[in-house]
Amino acid sequence: MKIGIIGAMAQEVEILLGYMAEPKLTEIAGCKIYEGKINNTDIALLQSGIGKTAAAMGTALLLQLTKPEMVINTGSAGGLDANLNVGDIVISTEVRHHDIDVTAFGYEKGQLPANPAAFMANEQLAQIAIKETEKAGFNAVSGLICSGDLFVNGNDMIARIRNDFPSVKAVEMEAASIAQVCHAFQVPFVVVRAISDVADKESHLSFDEFLPLAAEKSSEIVLAMLNNFA
């Protein structure tokens, strides 16, 4: 079994890379794909770059070149749920785009033509993530994660997203595109991210300060998940 793991930034993949035995690097179109073993499991680890286009391009390359049987998206996110604080874990049950609007043609907010409104995470993977988060003693929330090509920072932006997607738990900039590509390739996925900032007007300051903590927490859960497939 081979598992694909995707993070946008170097900080979000470097801890996992440190556990990989003799990684083989492929660089293509700005993406870095590391192949090797972690805990005796074959892993293809992608550093995609930031944003939905980079994530989609990288995910397609990962799936086409390395053929993983499942995908875990790791990294950081901004918390929109009242029960989430910096360092907590958010696990996807579904993922949607929050910056797409073709409702004039009868689609739901965030839905693209020829695609579902929500990309559903694999239930088994989500349950494994929840189990390992509980074992680690971390606070976690599962539910809707929304993605857009903007850093959510400010009350007006937060109000719009909450109005359009009342059940949203967290926001970030890649997961919906990763999920969309996985949907097209029929590869199961889950998003497991740690909260680096609680989305408000100071979230950009919190993100810079707490990104290392978020990377550490999310990587710990992903590593624990891998033990279920060894």
From Swiss-Prot:
SUPFAM superfamilies: Purine and uridine phosphorylases (SSF53167). It comes from the Bacteria. The active site is at residues 12, 197. GO terms for cellular component: cytosol. The keyword ATP-binding does not apply. Keywords: Amino-acid biosynthesis, Hydrolase, Methionine biosynthesis. The keyword Hydrolase applies. Belongs to the PNP/UDP phosphorylase family. MtnN subfamily. Catalyzes the irreversible cleavage of the glycosidic bond in both 5'-methylthioadenosine (MTA) and S-adenosylhomocysteine (SAH/AdoHcy) to adenine and the corresponding thioribose, 5'-methylthioribose and S-ribosylhomocysteine, respectively. Also cleaves 5'-deoxyadenosine, a toxic by-product of radical S-adenosylmethionine (SAM) enzymes, into 5-deoxyribose and adenine. This is 5'-methylthioadenosine/S-adenosylhomocysteine nucleosidase. The lineage of its organism: Bacteria, Pseudomonadati, Pseudomonadota, Gammaproteobacteria, Pasteurellales.
